[in-house]
A protein has these predicted regions:
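Bacterial N-terminal signal peptides
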Residues: 10-19
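Sec/Tat signal peptide C-region and signal peptidase I cleavage site
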Residues: 19-25
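Active-site catalytic motif of lipid deacylating hydrolases and related acyltransferases
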Residues: 29-105
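Serine-dependent carboxylesterase/thioesterase catalytic core
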Residues: 42, 87-187, 242
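Bacterial N-terminal signal peptides that target proteins for export
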Residues: 1-10
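Short aromatic-enriched loop/helix-cap "lid" or pocket-rim segments at secondary-structure transitions
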Residues: 52, 144-149, 219-225
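C-terminal catalytic-base region of ester-bond hydrolases, centering on the histidine
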Residues: 198-302
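Solvent-exposed loop/turn segments at secondary-structure junctions
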Residues: 43-47, 77-81, 110-115, 138-142, ...
Length: 302
């Protein structure tokens, strides 16, 4: 009996030494446990929660956390100037950095969230603390949709349109002193190409990468019907697009490609790429897309 106990004790001791060693040798079993925490930055027209009910990123944070990622979600005004959003983002970014104690953070932005984060990095001094900037469907060269919308509003009515939108966003979304009109101007192609980009250069030491999304087909009864007016405008002026941003405009830094879902689908639109509406896009799994993105950052040492 004593001999059996000794054998069992010895085996348990060996297992206790062997199992951690195997884990160490094989590395983490998680795909998305990046070296630096991930910070998500939402786009124009919404905050971290749409109408205070629907999560902007839907199931993406959960998918990342399930694979070991440390994820933080920032929230700025839905409608405001790029600079105002950048300032608000900077404040939250530094708070996250302080809480985590991390030397740097990885930024993943969508839509306007790719632009105001660039402003915060290059012009507001965040670049020493940013490991990577991943852009998802970002209007880096503006959008013809913004050009058209701004262009059709008569100068005499700009104040009325702007004030009306500001009231809506302050009342429904809880924005603080929003500036909808300026947000529209900041997304126009002339401003982005001639003013913003020349004054917002990429910073050395920050890894920049980007993805675009693309709608392949459009019909009144299609599930992407909400872009039935904007998709053809962009198609005419800029070519392939996701309903709000063209593939060309979305390219920034290391362009990783265009997500258009499986062959049998209508494509991947500007909302699908962040798991909307409500996490259902035939032929596209947003959770997997972002986990793979994080896994790639991990492999690159970020």
């Amino acid at each position: 009996m004593k001999f059996q106990k000794a054998v069992i004790t010895g085996l348990v001791f060996i297992l206790l030494l062997w199992i951690p060693g195997m884990a160490f040798a094989g590395g983490s079993s998680y795909k998305a446990d990046t070296k630096y925490p991930i910070v998500l930055a939402h786009g124009m027209g919404a905050s971290a929660e749409i109408l205070g009910i629907v999560d902007y990123w839907w199931g993406i944070p959960g998918a990342l956390r399930d694979e070991g990622a440390t994820v933080y979600i920032t929230s700025v005004n839905g409608m405001d100037s790029t600079r105002n959003k950048a300032n608000a983002f900077k404040t939250q970014f530094l708070q996250i950095k302080a809480v985590t104690g991390a030397a740097k953070l990885n930024i993943i932005g969508h839509s306007h969230g790719t632009v105001y984060t660039r402003d915060a990095i290059s012009n507001l001094g965040l670049y020493p603390y940013v490991a990577s900037h991943s852009s998802i469907a970002g209007p880096h060269r503006g959008s013809a949709v913004a050009d058209v919308v701004v262009g059709i509003v008569p100068n005499s009515l700009e104040w009325l349109v702007g004030d009306t939108l500001d009231f809506i966003y302050a009342f429904l979304f809880g924005d603080t002193n929003p500036n909808s009109l300026q947000n529209g101007y900041d997304m126009t192609r002339p401003y982005m190409i001639n003013t913003f980009n020349p004054n917002t250069p990429n910073k050395s030491g920050v890894y920049y990468q980007s993805w675009a999304a693309r709608i392949k087909t459009m019909a009144v009864n299609a599930r992407n019907w909400y872009f039935i007016a904007t998709w053809p405008i962009l198609l005419y002026h800029e070519g392939a697009n996701d309903g709000l941003v063209s593939v060309t405009s979305a390219q920034w830094g290391n362009f990783r490609g265009t997500e258009d879902a499986s062959w049998y689908s209508a494509g991947c639109d500007h909302l699908n790429i962040v798991d909307q509406l409500f996490g259902y896009t035939p032929g596209f799994d947003a959770g997997t897309f972002y986990v793979d993105l994080a896994a790639d950052l991990k492999a690159r040492g970020y």
